Amino acid sequence: MSGSTGERSFADIITSIRYWVIHSITIPSLFIAGWLFVSTGLAYDVFGSPRPNEYFTESRQGIPLITGRFDPLAQLDEFSRSF
């Protein structure tokens, strides 16, 4: 037996003025906030990833590849000491 749950249909929601008033403000605000988060470099600081100019320093020019199958921890320690 099917019945109504009392919820508005999706078509009703997206055709209402209230929906578009709310979302015409929130969607661009989220886009601008994300753009500022990345462009100011705060994303690098929050997630701890190196900035593009910090991947290769003067003291560390090689690519940190792990080549040993049986001693990866020793290689990781060596890479982390070079930071």
From Swiss-Prot:
What HAMAP family does the record tag this protein with?
Answer: PSII_PsbE
Q: Which organism is it from?
A: Liriodendron tulipifera (Tuliptree)
Record's cofactor remark: With its partner (PsbF) binds heme. PSII binds additional chlorophylls, carotenoids and specific lipids.
Q: Where does heme bind?
A: 23
User: Gene Ontology terms, cellular component aspect?
Assistant: chloroplast thylakoid membrane; photosystem II reaction center
Record's subunit section:
Heterodimer of an alpha subunit and a beta subunit. PSII is composed of 1 copy each of membrane proteins PsbA, PsbB, PsbC, PsbD, PsbE, PsbF, PsbH, PsbI, PsbJ, PsbK, PsbL, PsbM, PsbT, PsbX, PsbY, PsbZ, Psb30/Ycf12, at least 3 peripheral proteins of the oxygen-evolving complex and a large number of cofactors. It forms dimeric complexes.
Q: Which family does it belong to?
A: Belongs to the PsbE/PsbF family.
Keywords in UniProt for this one?
Chloroplast, Electron transport, Heme, Iron, Membrane, Metal-binding, Photosynthesis, Photosystem II, Plastid, Thylakoid, Transmembrane, Transmembrane helix, Transport
Q: Which NCBIfam families match?
A: cyt_b559_alpha
Topology with regard to the membrane? Answer: Single-pass membrane protein
GO terms of biological process kind: photosynthetic electron transport chain
Q: Where in the cell is it found?
A: Plastid, Chloroplast thylakoid membrane
The cofactors required by this protein are: heme b
Recorded hits in PROSITE patterns, A to Z, give: CYTOCHROME_B559
This chain belongs to the protein called: Cytochrome b559 subunit alpha
- InterPro entries reported in the protein's UniProt record: PSII_cyt_b559_asu, PSII_cyt_b559_asu_sf, PSII_cyt_b559_CS, PSII_cyt_b559_N, PSII_cytb559_asu_lum
Is Signal found in the keyword set?
Answer: no
The record's listing under Pfam families reads: Cytochrom_B559 (PF00283), Cytochrom_B559a (PF00284)
UniProt-listed SUPFAM superfamilies: Cytochrome b559 subunits
Task: Give this protein's Gene Ontology molecular function annotations.
Answer: electron transfer activity; heme binding; iron ion binding
